[in-house]
């Protein structure tokens, strides 16, 4: 039984015809198990282009002094599999994954929370919004959903990822290199990883993810923000 998709539409802030919404949510594994139904891959292709143009335009106007190379790096920090998957997980109270139509095998191996599937599903929804409502509505939805990522992009380091940014921050403050303690739970096909960042023998952030890399990135982001907040309390720092 397919659960109500209204919370998903409410989170997107648009209405979509049932047929178009179902297509946007149909993963190829489900299509193949059900007689070769159409998949969401064409919509994903379209949504990728709409997302890329919208983010590129936003960055171009937000950062008039940045070079082409810098803008490309900023865009890559916003438009990537992990960022898209994170937006998808926060899309509504239950996340996008529970609404994606998956084949039994994919569903049984944690496909509903697989970053690649969530990212593809997010792009296919954006493609569907563009088809139904046009570019301006698609742009409005994208800027609302990806606004926090656009805001955070300029704060990231040269590598445009949180681990690089944290390492640069701790080095600049003479705190040494951060270390990561990673644990995992669950069976091999459905593991959940938890990472904790340690700086100068103190824990500054933690993160949970479906992969070690994802958990470490989330932990690094939390630690970076914590260190920024505690700037004046860091060793070697004095209050103004």
UniProtKB/Swiss-Prot annotation:
Miscellaneous comment: Was identified as a high-confidence drug target.
The name this protein goes by in its record: Ribonuclease 3
Every RNase III domain range: 19-134
InterPro entries, A to Z: dsRBD_dom, RNase_III, RNase_III_dom, RNase_III_sf
Primary enzyme class: hydrolase
NCBIfam families: RNaseIII
Main location: cytoplasm
Pfam family, one: Ribonucleas_3_3
Gene Ontology terms: cellular component: cytosol
Stretches assigned to the DRBM domain: 161-229
Catalytic reaction list: Endonucleolytic cleavage to 5'-phosphomonoester
One of the protein's GO biological processes: tRNA processing
E.C. no: 3.1.26.3
Name of encoding gene: rnc
